[in-house]
Design a protein with these regions (language model features):
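Short beta-strand/loop element within the Bergerat-fold HATPase_c
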Residues: 38-48
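Glycine-rich/acidic phosphate-handling loop/turn and adjacent ATP-lid/helix
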Residues: 50-80
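C-terminal beta-strand of the catalytic ATP-binding
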Residues: 56, 109-115
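Conserved ATP-binding N-box helix of the HATPase_c
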Residues: 14-36, 88
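Glycine-rich ATP-binding loops of the HATPase_c
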Residues: 94-104
């Protein structure tokens, strides 16, 4: 399910957006679960703010530890970098991310200033 629109006439670089979308969708594809699995992508722009919300069904439990981002359960040097890469790009645009879990889904919200 998608209601995503690329914002026109902004300073948002297409490569930066691809880093966000690639990492977020990889996370979703690796973790989507449940009886009726789904991934949902939506976005909107209000003035200079561009918001992206990505949801996926998830029957597990995220472990946040001491961070506001969940700990990875994978091994290897590159694993666990996806959300950090998304956050790095969002902060380049004076924004940030949040991750929530509830009702058997995970919700990733990304906010950026694009003007």
């Amino acid at each position: 399910l998608s209601d995503f629109h690329y914002p026109q006439n902004t300073k948002l670089n297409a490569f930066d957006l691809s880093v966000i979308m690639n990492n977020a969708l990889n996370n979703c594809m690796e973790n989507v679960s449940g009886d009726d699995p789904y991934i949902s992508i939506s976005s909107f722009r209000k003035n200079s703010i561009f918001m992206i919300t990505i949801k996926n069904s998830f029957g597990g439990q995220l472990n946040f530890g001491d961070s506001d981002l969940p700990e990875t359960t994978k091994s290897g040097r590159e694993h666990g970098m996806g959300l950090n890469n998304i956050r790095r790009v969002a902060r380049m645009y004076m924004g940030d991310i949040s991750l929530e879990q509830g009702n058997e889904e995970v919700i990733l919200s990304i906010m950026m200033q694009v003007e």
